[in-house]
């Protein structure tokens, strides 16, 4: 769902884990911590599955969750969204700093399978509902959703 369109700037992807599917995730046969996307001065985490916060702290060099610019969820499955709430709490210093962005499909925000806690949402600068085939921009980083 996320395609990074990188301009002429330093950019990187850091995989905090590549584990997926319930049995791999439940047993942590491979880490399932999502992906750090950096472009210019922007740092986002995409699909923060189980252990993302811990994997950020243990990565080399460490990724300070409080310095993230936002979180991108592609869908509501637990292996892609489990740590979204703790990351929102971290990047807003428990709501003391009104900052950061959350990009998520409607299913992650509404209904019986919503994965983002309502009390955390006002802590963020903005909560953006992702739509198909739409381009989004965070300063130096631009990305486009697929179908």
Q: Where on the chain are the PLM-derived regions?
A:
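Active-site metal-binding motif and surrounding structural segment of the metallo-beta-lactamase
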Residues: 51-103
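Short, Lys/Arg-enriched N-terminal segments with co-localized hydrophobic residues
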Residues: 1-7
């Amino acid at each position: 769902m996320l395609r990074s369109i990188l301009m002429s700037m330093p950019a990187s992807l850091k995989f905090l884990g590549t584990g997926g599917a319930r049995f791999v995730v439940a047993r942590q046969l491979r880490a399932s911590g999502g992906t750090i996307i950096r472009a210019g001065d922007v740092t986002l985490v995409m699909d923060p599955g189980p252990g993302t916060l811990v994997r950020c702290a243990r990565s080399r060099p460490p990724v300070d969750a409080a310095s993230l610019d936002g979180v991108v969820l592609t869908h509501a499955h637990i292996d892609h969204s489990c740590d979204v709430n703790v990351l929102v709490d971290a990047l807003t210093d428990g709501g003391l700093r009104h900052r950061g962005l959350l990009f998520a499909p409607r299913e992650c925000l509404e209904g019986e399978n919503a994965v983002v806690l309502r009390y955390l949402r006002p802590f963020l600068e903005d909560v953006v509902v992702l739509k198909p085939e739409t381009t989004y921009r965070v300063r130096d980083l631009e990305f486009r959703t697929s179908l």
